[in-house]
Amino acid sequence: MDGRISGSTQLLGLIGDPVAHSLSPAMHNAALAAMGENYCYVPFPVAPKHLAAAVAGLAAIGVRGFNVTIPHKQAILPLLDQIESRAAAVGAVNTVYPLPEGGWAGTNTDIDGFVQPLLGLEKGIPTLILGSGGAARAAIQGCLELGLGPVRVAGRSPNSLLALQQTWPQVETVNWAELNCYLSQTRLLVNTTPVGMHKPGSPAGQGLSPLSREQLGLLSPGAIVYDLIYVPDPTPLLRMAAELGHTPISGLEMLVHQGAKALSLWLGGKPVPVEVMRQAAQHQLAQV
């Protein structure tokens, strides 16, 4: 698309609350322009009480697909006509597409985005995931699909850890106070907690890290440290990891690749310019 909207322009979008700071519109519209596709990706702020009406409305106006972000990733499940098995396992949907017979299907491209930077890793790498919330569920599913393991999850909520083990019995859960015992065995560390995130307009979170430098020093030499946070870039966790000789991976990779997977799905499997999406996201981040 050349930037001009016509009567035949197709709509894609994002629903969430809020959506003002999302990088997705910049990423998707840059890719669509580079591909010459007559589509426009629009963010739609949708309050929880309006979710059902919004999902029906998007179908009514012929939207060709949409992403789902906080706080709707779980709440949207009963509103969909079909849910892919991996999304059902994770208990969350972030990408919705229309079924040929009508209605909506949901999948979870967060899993695809998460695994992309890890493709090529040997199987059986001991993995420790920090956090037991929704992001941890996508990370667990991704690690298991890659054949990594043992996969351990460290969290502070016994109930959340129990729920994870009920979904994935092969995953070992660890009380946060005991995680130091497992660091020396860890070759892949994944942070799914929000600790260290910088929110626009607020200094809170700057300088924070879920693990100390001393704890990072206990990791297996040359470990991979993957922080799902991408603001600031690098995060304190990744900066310290790099200084200690570990391999850092930014959460921006997950964001870009989940978006690319979703866009390809909406466009019938066409290849998507990932680098264009990455550059658009980085440019948008530089404005924050």
Swiss-Prot record:
Keywords: Amino-acid biosynthesis, Aromatic amino acid biosynthesis, NADP, Oxidoreductase. Pathway: Metabolic intermediate biosynthesis; chorismate biosynthesis; chorismate from D-erythrose 4-phosphate and phosphoenolpyruvate: step 4/7. The keyword Isomerase does not apply. GO terms for molecular function: NADP binding; shikimate 3-dehydrogenase (NADP+) activity. It comes from the Bacteria. GO terms for cellular component: cytosol. InterPro entries: Aminoacid_DH-like_N_sf, NAD(P)-bd_dom_sf, SDH_C, Shikimate_DH-bd_N, Shikimate_DH_fam. The keyword Amino-acid biosynthesis applies. Its EC number is 1.1.1.25. It catalyses: shikimate + NADP(+) = 3-dehydroshikimate + NADPH + H(+). NADP(+) binds at residues 131-135, 228, 251. Gene3D superfamilies: Leucine Dehydrogenase, chain A, domain 1, NAD(P)-binding Rossmann-like Domain. One of its GO terms (biological process) is chorismate biosynthetic process. Shikimate binds at residues 22-24, 69, 94, 110, 230. The active site is at residue 73. It holds the Pfam family SDH_C. PANTHER family: BIFUNCTIONAL 3-DEHYDROQUINATE DEHYDRATASE_SHIKIMATE DEHYDROGENASE, CHLOROPLASTIC, SHIKIMATE DEHYDROGENASE. Homodimer. NCBIfam families: PRK00258.2-2 (NF001314). Belongs to the shikimate dehydrogenase family. Involved in the biosynthesis of the chorismate, which leads to the biosynthesis of aromatic amino acids. Catalyzes the reversible NADPH linked reduction of 3-dehydroshikimate (DHSA) to yield shikimate (SA). This is Shikimate dehydrogenase (NADP(+)). It comes from Synechococcus sp. (strain JA-2-3B'a(2-13)) (Cyanobacteria bacterium Yellowstone B-Prime).
